[in-house]
């Protein structure tokens, strides 16, 4: 938390300096959220399926996530835009369970870690003939360290990306897309969307080049006195070609495309004095083309929130506390996504119910 407050102070200081030189802040946002997941870990019967209740022995992972982000207009630097987001996760994993023999291995916390991520990008509209596109030049970073008696560096990944955004009509729908050239490196447990983590390579790390080709669309099904229903689709395709030989085979790693396809819909009730309810259903399918297996996650969330806006001299401050519960979760895994809980099969379904409670704060500058 101290590091996050330090980042916040730094960003606000830089923003103040930027504004003094006629650069401007478009928006800034902060969120803090507590997450607790549960699964069935009852001795003799636990199978990682079904709603097993909010019992201590069924706890899986406790996460505290804090996010700080914003958007600046750098007037003195040729009207470049600067988009940034910093994320910190504090994780505790609890109750190590042997699903094969249906018994608890460790009662209570058996791992603690902290992960820092950032995504910082300069962007600008570039005109090529009659075509105008927003180009990004950005850097993504992710690093994890163990905490307390689990201390130790667990891995780092970096991604430098550059490329334009564009629009395309596909199956009768308009998609917003991105095409980016990528340089990446990774070490330890981090994979950077590669099919293998850094520790899978002989030197414990690797680097390479690739590309991102992402498509996204969304829209309204209805918006009336009964509330509103929105849908969304994202189709992410990330090519990674890493240099180096794998520990397992002694051969060069194959190039791979990470496929991440998400479809979902969210219904929100009409607001009553700022309060609203919501239901979200979503399906996410993931695969690495260079490896055997896939992961498919279907979930249904319910939630209750409150949203209000406060007019200030500099803009509008939005406060949005929200509580959500994942009542349905079916995560089917196969092959490389298998966590080894069963020796007899590499394909099975697991379930994690999850409770989330958090606060979102945003400032839209006039």
Where is each model-derived feature located?
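Outer-membrane beta-barrel "beta-signal"
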Residues: 325-327, 349-366
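Short glycine/proline- and aromatic-enriched beta-strand/turn motifs that initiate or cap beta-hairpins
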Residues: 20-73, 81-97, 356
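Gram-negative bacterial Sec-dependent N-terminal signal peptides
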Residues: 1-22
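Detector for outer-membrane/organellar transmembrane beta-barrel domains
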Residues: 171-291, 300
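Short loop/turn motifs that connect adjacent beta-strands in outer-membrane beta-barrel proteins
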Residues: 20-28, 73-82, 123-135, 166-178, ...
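Residues that define the transmembrane beta-barrel architecture of outer-membrane proteins
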Residues: 58-66, 112-120, 154-162, 203-213, ...
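Transmembrane beta-barrel strands of outer-membrane/channel proteins
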Residues: 30-38, 82-90, 135-143, 177-185, ...
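Outer-membrane beta-barrel translocator domains and adjoining extracellular loop/strand segments
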Residues: 41-58, 92-113, 144-157, 186-206, ...
């Amino acid at each position: 938390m101290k590091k996050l407050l330090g980042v916040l102070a730094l960003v606000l200081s830089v923003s103040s300096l930027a504004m003094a030189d006629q650069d401007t802040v478009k928006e800034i946002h902060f969120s803090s959220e507590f997450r607790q997941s549960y699964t069935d870990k009852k001795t003799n019967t636990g199978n990682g399926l079904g709603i097993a209740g909010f019992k201590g022995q069924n706890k899986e992972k406790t996460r505290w996530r804090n996010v700080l982000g914003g958007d600046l207009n750098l007037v003195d630097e040729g009207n470049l835009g600067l988009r940034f987001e910093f994320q910190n996760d504090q994780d505790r994993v609890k109750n190590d369970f042997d699903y094969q023999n249906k018994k608890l291995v460790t009662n209570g916390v058996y791992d603690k870690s902290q992960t820092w991520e950032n995504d910082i990008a300069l962007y600008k509209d570039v005109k090529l003939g009659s075509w105008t596109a927003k180009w990004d030049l950005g850097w993504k970073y992710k690093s994890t360290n163990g905490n307390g008696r689990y201390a130790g560096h667990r891995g780092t990944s970096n991604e430098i990306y550059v490329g334009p955004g564009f629009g395309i009509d596909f199956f009768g729908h308009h998609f917003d897309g991105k095409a980016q050239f990528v340089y990446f490196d990774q070490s330890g447990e981090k994979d950077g969307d590669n099919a293998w983590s850094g520790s899978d390579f002989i030197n414990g790390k690797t680097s390479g080049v690739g590309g991102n080709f992402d498509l996204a669309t969304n829209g309204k099904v209805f918006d009336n006195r009964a509330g509103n229903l929105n849908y969304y689709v994202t189709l992410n395709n990330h090519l990674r070609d890493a240099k180096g030989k794998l520990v397992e085979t002694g051969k060069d790693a194959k190039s791979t495309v990470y496929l991440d396809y998400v479809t979902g819909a969210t219904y929100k009730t009409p607001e009553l004095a700022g309060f609203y309810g919501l239901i979200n259903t979503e399906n996410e399918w993931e695969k690495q083309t260079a490896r055997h297996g896939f992961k498919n996650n279907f979930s249904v969330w319910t939630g209750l929130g409150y949203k209000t806006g406060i007019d200030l001299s500099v803009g509008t401050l939005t406060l949005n506390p929200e509580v959500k519960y994942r009542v349905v979760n079916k995560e089917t895994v196969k092959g490389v996504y298998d966590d080894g809980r069963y020796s007899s099969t590499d394909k099975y379904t697991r379930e994690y119910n999850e409770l989330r409670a958090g606060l979102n704060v945003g400032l839209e500058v006039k």
